[in-house]
Design a protein with these regions (language model features):
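P-loop NTPase switch/coupling surface
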Residues: 1-214
Length: 215
């Protein structure tokens, strides 16, 4: 059974939770229910992130007019490095800046006994920012990312559907999870979440998106 482990993230001091198909959280306000839900969403959508990054990698190598992925990728980067970079950005979007977090904060999700992802912080002079977000992945997942680096082919219509089908099949077998995940914040939390992330959202927008806000 999948397992979530959290240490010192937001209001959650410690948490070790086996994740079943149906879970119901009850408790006082600001007790960490939303933090746990967001953490599960963060990890459960990693497989979708890998798929979109692999598609972006293929289209970056062989551009096709009108074909695009929902995620952008740095030119020439490996699939593993692209995933690490994206998970850092995704963490900041989901939980906010890591600068004020305890240095011993970490969270990890065990999809299976052999497949897991861990997010922790590194306070080291080698990195340009304090509390650098460090990504640790299981050997099985690392092997998959290496074996499937630049494996999707491109046709005049976009990424090969057959290649993508095989890619998804192999990926879902590693995660033992083929379900789509949707996170819907509580209505009272929507404004709070938006206000916390507004500066970051604006900073990541391109010039055209920023101009559209003024029209």
């Amino acid at each position: 059974m999948p397992k979530l482990i959290i240490n010192k993230l937001g209001p959650v001091e410690t948490c070790e939770l086996e994740c079943s198909q149906f879970m119901n959280f009850t408790g006082f306000q600001a007790s960490g229910k939303s933090t746990i839900a967001k953490a599960i969403y963060y990890f459960r959508t990693i497989k979708d992130d890998i798929i979109e990054l692999a598609k972006s990698q293929a289209l970056d190598a062989t551009p096709v007019y009108g074909a695009k992925s929902t995620l952008s990728i740095e030119h020439g980067i490996t699939l593993r490095k692209a995933l690490e970079n994206y998970l850092r950005e995704k963490f900041l979007r989901t939980f906010g800046s890591s600068w004020g977090m305890p240095n011993d904060m970490y969270m990890e999700y065990h999809f299976t006994e052999a497949c897991y992802v861990k997010i922790s912080l590194e306070n080291d002079s080698r990195y340009s920012t304090p509390n650098y977000i460090w990504i640790t992945m299981s050997n099985e997942l690392i092997r998959f990312l290496k074996a499937n680096n630049h494996t999707l082919s491109v046709t005049p219509l976009g990424v090969s559907e057959e290649d993508l089908r095989i890619f998804k099949k192999n990926l879902y077998e590693i995660f033992e999870d083929s379900c789509s995940v949707v996170y819907i914040p509580a209505g009272r939390s929507m404004i709070t979440l938006l206000s916390q992330q507004l500066s970051y959202i604006y900073a990541t927008m391109d010039d055209m998106q920023k101009r559209s806000l003024d029209t």
